Amino acid sequence: MADYFATLTIPKNTIPPNISSTTVTIEGDILVGFYRLIPPGWAGLAHYRIKYGLEQLHPANEGAWDTGDNIRDFVPLNWKMPEHKLTLTIEGYNEDTSYDHTVYLWFRTEELEYARPTTLLKEILSLLKEIFGVEG
């Protein structure tokens, strides 16, 4: 399991097609999801989305943007990564005429062997067999 941190500060008056963007490189087999912090003050005026190449990962509906105000939560994705190491792009725009706004993101990845419950159960069974001296 690994966590990768990214921020995107979106300058005021940044309206599409003039958007801000940043990238984050992550490693793993499964992008479990991400924690997000949208600080107070956004008032729904700043917007962001997460993409892998041309594929939009969040929000799930293509062409949509996420926004909010004072949000701290985890967004599950459970996305099987097409490459073990890849780069995500975070894009944003800001309708606010007075302030820049920043979104804070922590991406959580896992290796496939740890993401599968059956692997964990096999490890537990193997450990129990070892503890109790059972062979096979």
Show where each model-derived region lies.
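Beta-strand-centric surfaces of beta-sandwich/beta-rich domains
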Residues: 1-28, 38-136
